[in-house]
């Protein structure tokens, strides 16, 4: 009996120690991985240009982060963050920590806003793609005014932003050459049957309504347009490398989404 009690005490002590150490680690790291990339920003690291305009009809802007001491006689490289939020929420400020981190490593970085579906405007993926492309044009013009030549870029994003980053990388419309793309938990194929949860969030009562919202078109056959806005369907032989990350569980993005993209890559 005494031996059993002693064993139980060891178990209790172990559990308490584990819980305390976990809480200490959480308090030290905060929201990982974002806490791990936090940068104490100052003029020695770079300069931030806030709320810069680019061509769009809805007043969207971008923020630009320029590292200190860049050599204007050499080619420079751009990383663009596109925020997530199920295409109906989020803002360019969501990318601040990432932009500061990559700027501290010597990359010109930017984070952009785009038209959201909750704003009650024409907010199709086609429009968002065009806005992202126009933002890149504005960034190129702005950095050239500053005396920098951006020779290549990598778009990145989370969830919805990852989709727009992939579309920018795969469709060949970026004025700055895209060398690779990286994203986390991004939709890759907008097959309506996969998106019942998003339809519920957006209060859509039919697959046709979903397709109309995503494409901005009121037509009967959406197959071609759904493919035209889906990264997995626009990957081709000229694809750039992609670094992708998906969780084992996701309350929003269906787990099969990564396989659509992987299968598309395996075709070429």
Q: Which role fits each region the language model picked out?
A:
Residues 238, 244-246, 250:
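Short beta-strand/loop motif that positions the catalytic acidic residue
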Residues 155-157, 184, 245:
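Short beta-strand immediately N-terminal to the catalytic nucleophile in serine-hydrolase-like folds
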Residues 30-40, 167-220:
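Hydrolase active-site cap/lid region
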Residues 54-55, 90-99, 110-152:
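Catalytic nucleophile-loop/oxyanion-hole region of alpha/beta-hydrolase
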Residues 29-73:
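N-terminal cap/lid segment of alpha/beta-hydrolase-fold proteins
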Residues 75-84:
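Short beta-strand element of the alpha/beta-hydrolase
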Residues 251-260:
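Conserved alpha/beta-hydrolase "acid-adjacent" motif
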Residues 157-167:
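Glycine-rich nucleophile elbow surrounding the catalytic serine of serine-hydrolase chemistry
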């Amino acid at each position: 009996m005494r031996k059993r009690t002693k064993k139980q005490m060891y178990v209790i002590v172990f559990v308490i120690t584990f819980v305390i150490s976990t809480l200490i680690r959480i308090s030290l790291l905060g929201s990982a991985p974002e806490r791990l990339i936090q940068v104490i920003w100052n003029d020695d690291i770079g300069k931030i240009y806030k709320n810069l305009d680019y061509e769009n009809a809805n007043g969207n802007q971008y923020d630009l982060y320029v590292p200190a001491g860049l050599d204007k006689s050499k080619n420079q490289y751009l990383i663009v963050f596109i925020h997530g939020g199920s295409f109906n929420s989020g803002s360019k400020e969501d990318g601040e920590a990432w932009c500061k981190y990559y700027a501290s490593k010597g990359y010109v970085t930017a984070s952009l806003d785009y038209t959201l579906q909750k704003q009650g405007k024409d907010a199709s993926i086609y429009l968002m793609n065009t806005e992202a492309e126009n933002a890149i044009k504005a960034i190129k013009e702005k950095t050239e005014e500053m005396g920098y030549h951006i020779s290549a870029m990598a778009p990145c994003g989370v969830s919805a932003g990852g989709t727009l980053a992939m579309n920018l990388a795969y469709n060949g419309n970026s004025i700055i050459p895209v060398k690779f793309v990286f994203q986390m938990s991004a939709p890759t194929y907008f097959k309506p049957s996969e998106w019942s949860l998003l339809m519920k969030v957006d209060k859509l009562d039919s697959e046709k309504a979903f397709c109309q919202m995503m494409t901005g078109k009121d037509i009967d056959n959406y197959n071609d347009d759904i493919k035209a806005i889906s990264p997995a369907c626009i990957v081709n032989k000229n694809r750039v490398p992609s670094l992708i990350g998906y969780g084992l569980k996701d309350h929003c993005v269906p787990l099969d989404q990564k396989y659509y993209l992987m299968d598309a890559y395996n075709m070429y």
